Design a protein with these regions (language model features):
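Catalytic machinery of carbohydrate-active enzymes
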Residues: 1-319
């Protein structure tokens, strides 16, 4: 059996789709999988069992689909985890016996993980028993990484791909890092030009205070990003793809929310995560930039609040 899967575009969505992917894998144990999608989503599932990875060419996706029609020949099942119209066209170009399309308007108030699971349950008329986040990577170490100086590791993730509205201030991240710098090594994570600027700003603030810090922005693959996050002792993050990676590995995480719905994108089943947010009338606006121009949902959320939540988390963690 040959199964074609159009993966979600964003890293966080791809992580949240992982239980649904493994439900398909469990139901069709001997199937061959073609995983198609963005650079980051395909990299996340590069080691998925019995799979062929194809990176989507956004500039000429339909021409690419026509080529894939010849290359892949007949496909038994196709699943689109994207609700975009382009995804529907691609699946109709391919020689597919049965096609299933994710509808983002169904189960609108449910967590994104459950939305994806319901999509597969309804498509295949089955009941999903696998609901844990899961990635196919085999990590190099079996126990938390301890550095030579004996310090634990604090990871900072100041970026968020959706837009600037989701990003806590770089100086706030730096203040949190300064508070834990005596007990923790500091690692900064990020990707892309916009996040590079944020990461560099945090790095410079900490270096000026003679704090030892490593800036890993744009210096990791998806696999090494997962590995580095997995062995953090504490992770401070915006609502983002790396936040969902930390949930896979049950990392102690303080997740900072502003314009997005934490009921739908919170760290899934991570009992070692705590959410920090305000309760403003304008929240959640679900906008890429603040429509009111003040960005109070993030600016009024001060570093001391996050520091206190992190301390409580370290005291009361399930790990």
């Amino acid at each position: 059996m040959k199964i074609f899967i159009h993966l979600p575009t964003w890293l966080g969505d791809a992580v949240m789709a992982s239980p649904a992917l493994y439900v398909i894998k469990e139901h069709f144990k001997n199937a061959q999988f073609i995983l198609y999608g963005s650079l980051v989503s395909t990299a996340l599932f590069k080691e998925f069992p019995n799979s062929k990875i194809i990176i989507e060419n956004k500039q000429s996706r339909y021409k690419q689909a026509l080529s894939l029609r010849k290359e892949l020949d007949k496909i038994d099942l196709s699943f689109a985890f994207r609700s975009a119209f382009s995804s529907k066209i691609i699946l109709h170009i391919l020689k597919t016996k049965q096609r299933y399309f994710f509808d983002k308007n169904k189960h609108k108030e449910e967590h994104q993980v459950l939305k994806y699971l319901y999509f597969i349950e309804n498509s295949l008329h089955i009941k999903a028993h696998l609901k844990d986040l899961k990635l196919p990577f085999k990590l190099k170490f079996q126990s938390p990484l301890v550095l030579k100086n004996g310090k634990k590791i604090l990871g900072l993730n100041p970026g968020a791909s959706f837009g600037s509205a989701k990003r806590w201030d770089a100086s706030y991240f730096a203040k949190v890092a300064l508070n834990f710098s005596q007990s923790h090594e500091i690692l900064i994570f990020g990707a892309g030009k916009a996040e590079q600027e944020l990461c560099n700003e945090i790095y410079q603030i900490l270096k000026e205070q003679n704090i030892k810090v490593k800036n890993l922005c744009n210096k990791t693959t998806i696999k090494t990003l997962c590995q580095n996050i997995a062995f953090c002792d504490l992770f401070i993050t915006n609502d983002s793809g790396p936040m969902h990676i930390s949930a896979v590995y049950k990392v102690k995480t303080v997740a900072i929310f502003g314009p997005t719905k934490f009921t739908q994108t919170s760290p899934w089943q991570n009992e070692n995560a705590t959410l920090v947010h305000l309760n403003l009338a304008c929240m959640p606006c679900m906008q890429k930039t603040c429509p009111l121009k003040h960005h109070k949902c993030m600016k009024d959320l001060k570093p001391q609040r996050v520091i206190e939540e992190a301390r409580n988390l370290l005291k009361n963690s399930h790990l």
